């Protein structure tokens, strides 16, 4: 039997085993009986691991207790409060929250600070969604004033996050080199930016086309930057006499800066601005355009600094900068200051060009009369307006978002758990 099967054996397939009368033997071998080891079900390095729910092991798991010291200096173990544990749970799952409307401002501020500490606003998709939930519910409490002067890297990297801020009253985009085709210029005329009262657009390479785009919704639909009071368009050589005509829609404007532009007929432009808007040419520099009081204010003030530090740490090699600075100090060379570090605004206008002072202001006598006229005009347009949805857009954010505040007794009750 073994001799018949011998020619059919292939070396590539390996030995062929035959069981006969309860004994195992190899086909073609002279050994009738072969001692074999028991066959393994799995390989030698195989292992089985029983695991439950997979958790993120990269982050440190917070324990539900804290250690404090007594007056005597001994270590005391105490559990976290229920409010703190609940706050941590909501912070870890902030992207699953549907809305924050109706939550008290004090709790929302603590929740925003906790989410900021855990870098919940850094991810591209979930970070923008979480930030919009805060801005939609609390508006100017998240950010009321935003200063992006010379921070064009932050604008390019965090554009969607910046566009999510609503109910801003002051916005400084000076020295950011945006241009007429930038996406942020179109966003300025949208409904979330209708609460702006101060807008600084100095040195942004704007022309008459950019001014036309920015004021299109105000001139055609009567919506957009209708509450604007301070406008800075200086150091934009592309703005000419034709671009000034698009500014006549700002009826509440009190301060206007058109210095260092390409306006040819100065006297005619001054007369048009005085008759259409009621602004008078100022002989002295106006304090509002010195950018002294413009700064970022709100809950997200430190968040913007974290974004900017993260961007700079990614583009700047720290070791080479330190070694270069040490070598320059050793050889006595003067170090050149980087505009990114100092925040200096470098203008595009050449130094040889003669600077023209062209700043306008509204006299004190006309401020009260113009404001009353504008209020009456807005009320009449609301009554004769077509859509009730447009009326809702013009309502103040404070009336649209009723806020709940906690008293001292409420805080004592929360801390007692």
Curated annotation (Swiss-Prot):
Residues 360-399 are annotated as: Disordered. Coiled coil: none annotated. Keywords: Leucine-rich repeat, Repeat. It comes from the Eukaryota. LRR repeats lie at residues 167-188, 195-215, 227-249, 252-273. Pfam families: LRR_6. Disulfide bonds: none annotated. This is Leucine-rich repeat-containing protein 42.
